[in-house]
């Protein structure tokens, strides 16, 4: 008789609400802290995962504080502070270029409605570019000094965000999953949408319509061919 293999669990978690989420700014790579509501969302996520019997072998996280703080809260609630955590710029949010830090209506007044909104509609459309000497540009931030400057964005389409994370997904995350490791990935809405795209085989048009809520664990159960057999929110 063939032994029935348990599905492999993978959890994707968007960070809790940030101050700029609350105030409706384009955030991107802006390093913004959690709001009080976001801290509560992270606590709730940790309790939900613990109550549902989840545990993890390793965690992945972006370089941005709102994701890092969310992960720290979840790990504390679950008693998993000892776990190794892989932090990488490749899991950072999509870069919103010259829109970063702006509210939508201010951006529309400055850049026009189509230049502002096309990147919210089209998979291959990027926001207006930052100038290379802009202090918001990752090339001017010491934390990214070790990254090849040619790989650091001045703005990103969703297609470019997918291309940024794909090497990490294919060369690091998927091999861990193939070994049966239970992973928690804490990141950002647009970045997580590109992971969902690869997991579920969605099109660019489909992920542009997808929404991932702050602080709600998105759980996958994968067979040993890494095909999702179950997908649900806690």
From Swiss-Prot:
<dbReference type="InterPro" id="IPR001345">
    <property type="entry name" value="PG/BPGM_mutase_AS"/>
</dbReference>
<feature type="active site" description="Tele-phosphohistidine intermediate">
    <location>
        <position position="15"/>
    </location>
</feature>
<dbReference type="GO" id="GO:0006094">
    <property type="term" value="P:gluconeogenesis"/>
</dbReference>
<feature type="binding site">
    <location>
        <position position="66"/>
    </location>
    <ligand>
        <name>substrate</name>
    </ligand>
</feature>
<keyword id="KW-0324">Glycolysis</keyword>
<protein>
    <recommendedName>
        <fullName>2,3-bisphosphoglycerate-dependent phosphoglycerate mutase 1</fullName>
        <ecNumber>5.4.2.11</ecNumber>
    </recommendedName>
</protein>
<feature type="site" description="Transition state stabilizer">
    <location>
        <position position="188"/>
    </location>
</feature>
<dbReference type="Pfam" id="PF00300">
    <property type="entry name" value="His_Phos_1"/>
</dbReference>
<comment type="function">
    <text>Catalyzes the interconversion of 2-phosphoglycerate and 3-phosphoglycerate.</text>
</comment>
<feature type="binding site">
    <location>
        <begin position="93"/>
        <end position="96"/>
    </location>
    <ligand>
        <name>substrate</name>
    </ligand>
</feature>
<keyword id="KW-0413">Isomerase</keyword>
<dbReference type="GO" id="GO:0004619">
    <property type="term" value="F:phosphoglycerate mutase activity"/>
</dbReference>
<feature type="binding site">
    <location>
        <begin position="14"/>
        <end position="21"/>
    </location>
    <ligand>
        <name>substrate</name>
    </ligand>
</feature>
<comment type="subunit">
    <text>Homodimer.</text>
</comment>
<dbReference type="InterPro" id="IPR005952">
    <property type="entry name" value="Phosphogly_mut1"/>
</dbReference>
<feature type="binding site">
    <location>
        <begin position="27"/>
        <end position="28"/>
    </location>
    <ligand>
        <name>substrate</name>
    </ligand>
</feature>
<dbReference type="GO" id="GO:0006096">
    <property type="term" value="P:glycolytic process"/>
</dbReference>
<keyword id="KW-0312">Gluconeogenesis</keyword>
<comment type="pathway">
    <text>Carbohydrate degradation; glycolysis; pyruvate from D-glyceraldehyde 3-phosphate: step 3/5.</text>
</comment>
<comment type="similarity">
    <text>Belongs to the phosphoglycerate mutase family. BPG-dependent PGAM subfamily.</text>
</comment>
<dbReference type="InterPro" id="IPR013078">
    <property type="entry name" value="His_Pase_superF_clade-1"/>
</dbReference>
<feature type="active site" description="Proton donor/acceptor">
    <location>
        <position position="93"/>
    </location>
</feature>
<dbReference type="InterPro" id="IPR029033">
    <property type="entry name" value="His_PPase_superfam"/>
</dbReference>
């Amino acid at each position: 008789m063939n032994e029935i293999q348990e599905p492999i669990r993978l959890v994707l978690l968007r960070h809790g609400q940030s101050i700029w989420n609350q105030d409706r700014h384009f955030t991107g790579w802006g390093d913004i802290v959690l709001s009080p509501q976001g801290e509560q969302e992270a606590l709730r996520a940790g309790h939900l995962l613990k109550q549902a019997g989840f545990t993890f072998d390793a965690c992945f996280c972006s370089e941005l504080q709102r994701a890092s703080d969310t992960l720290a809260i979840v790990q504390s609630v679950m008693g998993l502070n000892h776990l190794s955590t892989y932090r990488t710029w490749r899991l950072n949010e999509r870069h919103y270029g010259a829109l970063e830090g702006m509210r939508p209506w201010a951006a529309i007044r400055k850049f026009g409605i189509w230049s502002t909104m096309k990147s919210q509609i089209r998979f291959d459309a990027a926001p207006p570019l930052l100038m290379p000497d802009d202090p918001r540009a990752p090339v001017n931030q010491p934390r990214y000094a070790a990254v090849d400057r040619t790989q650091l964005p001045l703005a990103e389409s969703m297609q470019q965000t997918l291309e940024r994370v794909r090497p990490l997904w294919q060369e690091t995350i998927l091999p861990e999953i193939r070994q049966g490791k239970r992973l928690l990935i804490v990141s950002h809405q647009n970045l997580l949408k590109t992971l969902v795209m690869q997991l579920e085989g969605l099109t660019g048009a489909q992920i542009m319509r997808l929404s991932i809520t702050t602080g709600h664990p998105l759980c996958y159960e994968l067979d040993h061919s890494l095909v999702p057999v179950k997908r649900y929110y806690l």
